[in-house]
Curated annotation (Swiss-Prot):
Gene3D superfamilies: HUPs. It catalyses: (R)-4'-phosphopantetheine + ATP + H(+) = 3'-dephospho-CoA + diphosphate. It comes from Clostridium beijerinckii (strain ATCC 51743 / NCIMB 8052). PANTHER family: PHOSPHOPANTETHEINE ADENYLYLTRANSFERASE. Its cofactor is Mg(2+). This is Phosphopantetheine adenylyltransferase. Substrate binds at S9, K41, L73, K87. The lineage of its organism: Bacteria, Bacillati, Bacillota, Clostridia, Eubacteriales. Belongs to the bacterial CoaD family. It comes from the Bacteria.
Amino acid sequence: MRVAVYPGSFDPITNGHLDIIKRGAKVFDKVIVAVLVNVDKKYLFESSERVELIKRVTRDIENVEIRSFDGLLVNFLKECKTNIILKGLRTASDFEYEFQMAFINKELDDDTETVCMMSSAKNIHISSSTVKQVARFGGDISGLVPNEIISDIMSRINL
């Protein structure tokens, strides 16, 4: 069974993330969406909330599992009994960052492999940061995130 781990903050999950999850689920037998817990970072949603939001928008994808993790990704991979990291790339700067991270992960565990998927053209401009910024200024985020979570984002932004 080929299992890939798709790690990220997903704060919040975007249509770009969801696209990578759906496409990854067609390539791999199982995709584990790994929601990063970083106590040093300020998030819009707590990790448990991010897990629930992702579960809500992926409920119809049978071979997707959502989990949170902290610590080194290579250790989480071992826990998941896989060596494959799935990453989405939007821009050249994403590539440069993920290229470096792939080498770091390979240095930490030589069995680790990173598989990158190019973003779909319709999602190349979407990032969680952009979603939050647009929402904070009252803009329409309906084309940026799954419809099921728009109210969650807007109510959190407007606290």
